[in-house]
């Protein structure tokens, strides 16, 4: 599923000089000949129609276009039909970094416009805000990134991917205590990527969580000598069966 650690693996490296592009004047209104549809609730038929014709694997992985010379043209079509299509947003962002262009070849607008359009279309979609936040992180707008990621957390709490990216944002701001907090939140929910933990270790800011109080008490109890008469009964304290010999050790 797209929300998994795949986001961390697919992000391209490098920065693009970015300015803000927002609103219908800069980024176009949302009217479209086909759609726009909410990708979360769109029919399988509509998804297949667009993904099969435009958002193919070769387009998603930025190898080539399907109906145009550039993958950006097919990604643009996909995002005009489904403004909050998460994998298409990720691909448009990565294409921008790959080409080192704010407006990738084949796109109608600069890359930030696609995040703006997705937010205007469905402001309650947490993963639009996650991806927008990741984009802002990549172009060095960290405070804005944190604002987007925190808004996503309010919409979708207890999500390890959100926690991980919040941790990265705070790390880049050198707010290591906050980064550590979100790292623990992410890893407690079994987030698989070790990058944030390794970053914190390199700056000496990583700390393991202490064991929960109940676990600490259990460990202390196990290591203390038992009080007289307090040990639970075992077969060793029961009468030995007649068939036993003095060398046998009864099982607990």
Residue ranges and their predicted role:
Residues 18-74, 81:
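N-terminal leader/linker segments that initiate helical-solenoid repeat arrays
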